[in-house]
Amino acid sequence: MTGQSRIGVTGLAVMGANLARNIARHGVPVAVHNRTGARTTEFIEAYGDEGEFTGTQSLQEFVDALERPRRIIVMVKAGKPVDGVITELTPLLDEGDIIIDAGNSHFPDTVRRTAECAANGIRFMGVGVSGGEEGALLGPSIMPGGDPEAYAEVKDVFEAIAAQVDGTPCVVHVGPGGAGHYVKMVHNGIEYADMQLIVEAYDLLTHVAGLDAPAIGKIFEEWNSGDLESFLIEITGKVLAKVDEKTGGPLVDVIVDRAGQKGTGTWTAIDALGLGIPLTGITEAVFARGLSALRDERKKASTTLAGPNPSAAEDRTDLVDDIRQALYASKVVAYAQGFAQMRAASLQNDWNLDLGAMATIWRGGCIIRAQFLNRIRDAYAEHPDLDNLLMVPYFTEAVANAQDAWRRVVVTATEQGVAIPAFSSSLSYYDGYRRERGPANLIQGLRDFFGAHTYERIDAEGSFHTRWAQDGTEVRTD
C-alpha cells in the first residue's frame, strides 16, 4: 500500500457506498472497506471507474492505505456495530488520527465515544448526514460535530460533497462533542412532525372534503409553492399520483396504514422532556406512529367505539384553503419547538449552536429542505438570541393571519371524528404560549397540598407552604 488515499470509508451498504462515490467523484482518492470483503470487491467492480478508489480486504490494509493523519468515515448501523468498528480500529491508528461516525448515532453515545477515543489519542467526530441514498450520492446536508481542528482536516471534502444552495454548501461545523448528532436528531424529529402534519391534511382532504388520492395529489402540487414549498410536499404529490400496477388504482390506497420508525423521533421527544421543552408536534407525531402500529386493535375498535356521524363539507374550496393555512401555522409551531429545543440543549451543553446556520444547511440535500427555512435563517440573522420563532414579526403575523382557519380546521375535525393530533396540539401550544397567566397556579397548590412542594406568590419574593392538614396558615420556606 502506498498510503495515498486522502480519506477512507468503512461500511459499504447503500449510504456508505454512495458517500464514497460522491467523495471520489470530486477528485478525492478514497480507500474503501467492508466487514465482508466480497462487498468491497463488488463495489470496486461496479464503481471503480467513477474515481480513484483503493479497495481493501482487511482493516489493517485499509488503515495502511490512508495518508496521515488518517481520516476514516464509519458508515455502519448505529449502536454496538459502531463501537465494534472503533474497538477494532483503535490499535491500528496513531495519535491524531480521526474517526468520523457519519451514521444516525444517538448523541450521548457520541459524547462517550469522543472521550474514549481521546483517551487513546484519537480524534472523534459525530457527523449527521441527511438526504437518504440520493443525498449521499448527489449532495447531502452535513452536520459535523467534534473537535474543530479535526473538522479542519476534512472541511474541504465535506464542502465539496455537500448540497449547494445559492452557492453555499449545506455544511457547517455545528459544535463540539455530540452537537452534530444532536442537531441531526432534532432534524429527524422535525421531519416526523412535518410528515404527520402532511398526513393529517391528507386525512382531512380525504374524509372531510371527500377527495380521492389523485385530486389530493394535485392540491399538494399546487401547495408546493410559496411558503409551503418543500421536498416533502413535493413528494407527497408524487406518492398520491402514483398508480398501482396491480389494481389500477392509487398506490397509496393499497398501502397498509402502519407507519414504521427507527427511533430518532423518540430520542428527540425524550430529550425534550429532559430539557423541559414542550415539543408537542414532534411528540404527537411519534405517538401517532405508535397508534398506527396498533392495527389489529384499531380494527376491533372501529366496530365498537362510538363516534360522530360524518357529513360532507358544505364548501370544499374554503375547507381546502383552511387546511392549507392550518398546515402552515402548525409547521411554524413544529419548527419553533424544534429550534427552541436546540437552543436549550446548546445552553445546557455549552455548544454555542448557530441556529441560523442550522436553518441554512437544511435548505438543501436533507429531507426537510424547504423554502420556509430561508425565513428561519433570516430570523436568526436579525435576532441571534431569539427565544422562540413565533416572536419574529414575520411568523407572528403569518400565524395571526392563519389562526381563524386553523381553529376552524380543528373544530371541523373534532366534529367529524378525524384525529389530527399534530394540528390540534400545535394550536394548543400556540394558545398556551401566548397566555400571560395560565392555570399552573392550581397545579402548584395541589402539589403543595399533597407533597409540601411549596409555591411562589405573585405579590412576594420567596417560596411558601400552606399547612393544609394543620391550621391552614402559610409559612415561608426559604
Region spans (language model):
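Glycine-rich, highly charged phosphate/nucleotide-binding loops
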Residues: 54-61, 78-86
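C-terminal substrate-binding/catalytic lobe of Rossmann-fold NAD(P)-dependent dehydrogenases
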Residues: 179, 192-415, 419-420
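C-terminal amphipathic alpha-helical interaction region
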Residues: 400, 405-478
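Short, ordered loop/turn segments at secondary-structure junctions
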Residues: 35-36, 104-105, 129-130, 417
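Hydrophobic beta-strand scaffold residues
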Residues: 30, 55, 124-125, 279, ...
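NAD(P)+-binding Rossmann beta1-loop-alpha1 motif at the extreme N-terminus of oxidoreductases
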Residues: 1-70, 93-96, 133-136
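Rossmann-fold dinucleotide-binding core
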Residues: 7, 64, 82-85, 100, ...
